[in-house]
Amino acid sequence: QDNIPIFRYHVAFDFEDNTDFIEWYANVMYRSYYTSDIPCSINDEYLTLSTCSTEIYDSRFVVVARKLRDGEDASQYTYYSNPDARKPAAFYKAYGMKVPDDKGPDYDYYKDILSKMEGNEN
């Protein structure tokens, strides 16, 4: 059993308020294998693709993308691997690794990141 709540990414859409958006964004970034400096806001449009994963039993591989804004060029951003991507407890156990002892994403940390993004009204 994991010590953090299950991220219900499949029910996240039409955020009620900025708090809901920050919670969703923090969970996405906390689990991301790859990350970038692409600015994100509650007003952007997002696409979520989810498929079966063979890493561990009954798991999913999820891709989240943000629609380009008018006049935006995706090549202006930097993309990199995230060595700290949080995986489900079952992943660590399946590969004989210690399950991280954390409480989930640090919402204040991700809220601060969002507030520093250029053109972000969060």
How should these model regions be labeled?
Residues 1-122:
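Extracytoplasmic/periplasmic soluble domains downstream of a signal peptide or transmembrane helix
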